[in-house]
Amino acid sequence: MENNRIREEVLETIRYAVNNSPFYRTHFSTALLGELTHETFRQLPFTTKEDLSQHNRDFLCVPAEQVAEYVTTSGTSGKPVTLYLTKKDLQRLARNEKESFELTGAKAGDLFQLMTTIDKQFMAGLAYYLGVQELHAGMIRIGPGVPALQWNSILENKPDILIAVPSFLITLIDYAKQNGIDVNQTSVRSAICIGEPIREDDLSENVLAKRIHADWNIELFSTYASTEMGAAFTECRAHRGGHLNGELIYLEVLDDDGKEVPHGEKGEIIVTTLGTEGTPLIRYKTGDVARVYRETCSCGRTSPRIGPILGRKNQMIKFKGTTIFPPSIYEIFDSRSEVTCYKIEVAKDYL
């Protein structure tokens, strides 16, 4: 543990979970829960997606009547699971997004246009909405799709910041070209990008970001978040990785042997949530692989940062002594304008 404050917060999270979660009550050995050190913490077993799926309700730490929101994971890597949020958890979520927005230069009085869903138990849309309120800014909740409606709102309401899946920004650009709209003569100054990477492994712009910037001169911010952690890693204006909010998440980035990777190296993101009431998670294996950067950012912040998600650990392809993640293959096809649809299959060559 880096310092006494972090150690106490992590220890408090563990005590709370063991005292209130049926899952953690049996998951941890009491012999490991005394004096918490860096070494004893690393001896605690991981929490996996399978644990959360198979014992979902046993993670709940409060009576059902204290649950204010039920949110679910996307299910992209398995069966969707439910996370239970109390009013305090919603306040934590709002604080996280407010501070994430501030990293991008957003401020009170700005106007956001939300181009993602806020229904269907989707946490991200809810988090963005709460964060905007906490920032004392304004929000236009359009939701996903419908380029005509999005542009009508942009031209009429003049938002400063868009929250969108970056590939949808390409759709907006195409619509604007077809309808005589000059994208660079609008009020929009930036877009907070969700769900898709806009950075290469070296933190430079990837093909998608370059395609957007070829037509639209707005600042793009990369984010990484998950429903389970209830927090986000967001770029500052230096665009050198998403900053950790160390008051909400304790971060580990580990190699295949469970050892912390050095600065600039890649590993699996492991999180322990801090300050959660409904569904705290301890040493949760996200399955996502990214590089970690620990040097002081040029913005002056000293918090660790993570690069773009290179892929999911369970989707890693080993080919002729090299490790490949599917997103690196996607980018090759995405860079070819003549390719509109593709499918990738991985098989062993037995011939």
What spans do the regions from the language model cover?
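Active-site glycine/GP-rich loop and adjacent strand/helix microenvironment
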Residues: 1-16, 135-351
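Generic structural marker for isolated residues within well-ordered, non-membrane alpha-helices
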Residues: 70, 97, 129, 209, ...
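AMP-binding/adenylate-forming
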Residues: 87-102, 111-171
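Residues that mark the start of a beta-strand
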Residues: 109-111, 189
